[in-house]
Amino acid sequence: MLFKSLQSIVSSSSSTNSKVQIENQTSLGMKSFNKVSLLDHLSIFNGNKNNSLDLL
């Protein structure tokens, strides 16, 4: 998913409007990606992924 966003940025960098939209999509993608890695770290501390998922 992240690589598709990066490819879209490269392919549409000529158009300013679509570039802004794609950057917004990419920042949203990064936020969800960071949330996933945060869950992984929480599951390491808790020893149980279900506990960390319940926190959301």
Swiss-Prot record:
Q: Please indicate which superkingdom the organism of origin belongs to.
A: Eukaryota
State the residue spans of region: Disordered: 1-21
Q: Where is the composition biased (Low complexity)?
A: 1-18
Q: What is this protein called?
A: Putative uncharacterized protein DDB_G0280433
Classification of source organism: Eukaryota, Amoebozoa, Evosea, Eumycetozoa, Dictyostelia
